[in-house]
Amino acid sequence: MRYIKTTMHYCLIVSRQALRLSWVFMALFLIACSSTPKDSSKRSDGKNIDDSITATGEGGIPAGFDVDAPNENPYLADKSDGPSGARSLFNNAISAMQQENWQRAEVLLQQLTTEYPKLSGPFLNLGIVYHKLDRKEDAETAFNNAIKANSLNLDAYNQLGLLLREEGRFNDAEAQYKKAIAVWPKHAASHKNIGILYDLYMGELNKALNHFEIFQYLQPEPDRQMAGWIIDLKRRIGN
């Protein structure tokens, strides 16, 4: 099995926005099996991927992409501080997660969610802890609570989508990724995750290609691995 790990907002220093941001410990956004598109350096026609790495995005805007959507993640746009009384507790929870002391992290995060139920980040991280402990039902509840606390928390939708995908609930996972994209159409990770879901688990290759191309379009510089995935997917579709 091939693991593609993305650490999102994982920080050891609690900043002014620490309790508002969705700190994620080793967020496994993209866990794909060996059928993940090959990251080869050659196309079937013998050309290097580098020769076509900008093929998606430069020739036009991907279908269905909202170019007029805000450029800033709406969850991060809120610059308000979190409660000062929770910062030390949250920092200790993050430290416990770094040390993989899941039981201590659980206790600290449960305390945070009890004392500060309007904060989304602690619920999100509690869900990640439960996921690590293979307590999937508890993890699902925590991720849903994170979304309830702040419906703009894109990481929570994606973590929930990952969990549901692992359980074989592909339609439910799809719904979570779609919700994240509805919140912010320019969230690249959501497009990548739903693309993987469509490609590897639901057999919706054209939909997967569309979201992969949107992901690539959103990159400041073309992503070489994604370019390889797009080429492989087009080959399988017959484009």
Describe these PLM feature segments.
Residues 31-32:
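C-terminal motif of bacterial Sec signal peptides marking the signal peptidase cleavage site
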Residues 79-119:
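Alpha-helical segment of the N-proximal tetratricopeptide repeat
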Residues 86, 120-121, 154-155, 188-189, ...:
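Helix-start (N-cap) detector for alpha-helical repeat units in TPR-like alpha-solenoids
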Residues 99-107, 132-145, 166-179, 203-214:
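Structural signature of tandem alpha-helical TPR/SEL1-like repeats
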Residues 115, 149, 183-184, 217-219:
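Structural marker of alpha-solenoid helical repeat scaffolds
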Residues 125, 159, 193, 228-229:
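Canonical tetratricopeptide repeat
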Residues 200-239:
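Terminal, low-structured helical/coil segments at or just beyond the last alpha-helical repeat
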